[in-house]
Amino acid sequence: MNTVRVTFLLVFVLAVSLGQADKDENRMEMQEKTEQGKSYLDFAENLLLQKLEELEAKLLEEDSEESRNSRQKRCIGEGVPCDENDPRCCSGFVCLKPTLHGIWYKSYYCYKK
């Protein structure tokens, strides 16, 4: 009976000491995995940030191309009423007070220079 107790006590002590070592080892492994996970998350975050910056650059480039290619405001042709303060006559035309026709309208018209 005494040998059974000693054997049981020996097995118990070995199990506790090895279990404690495994617990410390597991803690170290978990800490390493957590650090690796953080580095992986940092890497993924940087990669996502680069992709977003590339996408933003493309969008801004498209906006600048669109504004460059956008149609200008339409201009007013010959004999069309215009505003003397904001003449939008086409190039080669000027906003003048009418000479003969259109005197009764009391407005300005686009005429050739």
From Swiss-Prot:
Belongs to the neurotoxin 14 (magi-1) family. 01 (HNTX-16) subfamily. It is found in: Secreted. This is U11-theraphotoxin-Hhn1k. One of its GO terms (cellular component) is extracellular region. InterPro entries: Toxin_22. It comes from the Eukaryota. Residues 1-21 form the signal peptide. Residues 22-74 form a propeptide. Expressed by the venom gland.
